[in-house]
């Protein structure tokens, strides 16, 4: 039922658009309304009337001719979708040709129904208006027509031939994105990112790269980036037994490790000098110096 109403609303909007482009005279509208009223009052005689008109070559062609003109590309049809009528009862009216615009398009008459199934009556509706089928697929009306904006019915997307597609199953057809569609798309994208991350993938398909720093080289962990300055360093050892302080002073090569205790190390790089200025003038390098009180320790 919703698809039928959507189709009727679409056809009604096309009729209104055609009327805005080429208004029809009041005489033609009156004659067409009288003809449709006669057919709707006697639905059982519609087929017989059509056969008589086809044999005699006369009938309702005059109002349709004055309204829209040529039907050479395809004869107009009466489409009654309400009050028990169906597309099987659709009949073709013979209309003389005039001002043919396209050989592959036809002229159709449409009823307009409200949501309760009642036919909408009045000159401003599309009950008695004949419009050319095969109009452009753009269903947007010009100059701010509010009917298309306030309609709750999804009329579908136009196909390549210019007709609205309304029968594609039970799934609704939308002309644009809904908020739920955007949320679903974002959620799916996040889920895909998490899935790839859990597998240890570096996101090659999504254009994202996860840069991880390389692990440190164990062979270079204990070495310094800058070379060690060659030479000697001065070391002092203090030992206090409660009454006296034992002090030792000496020099060790810069390349040797610093350790606890009075240790005179050797050069490991082979480039440190054997003695330095302090070593050369220090008389207590190999002699232990005794100090009885802490204030006696020289600066």
Swiss-Prot record:
The record marks 240, 246, 248, 250 as: Interaction with host STAT2. Disulfide bonds: none annotated. It is found in: Host cytoplasm. One of its GO terms (biological process) is symbiont-mediated suppression of host JAK-STAT cascade via inhibition of STAT2 activity. Keywords: Host cytoplasm, Host-virus interaction, Inhibition of host innate immune response by virus, Inhibition of host interferon signaling pathway by virus, Inhibition of host IRF7 by virus, Inhibition of host MDA5 by virus, Inhibition of host RLR pathway by virus, Inhibition of host STAT2 by virus, Interferon antiviral system evasion, Metal-binding, Viral immunoevasion, Zinc. Zn(2+) 1 binds at residues 232, 251, 276, 279. Gene3D superfamilies: 4.10.80.340. The N-terminus interacts with host JAK1 and STAT1. The C-terminus interacts with host STAT2. The C-terminus also interacts with host PP1. This is Non-structural protein V.
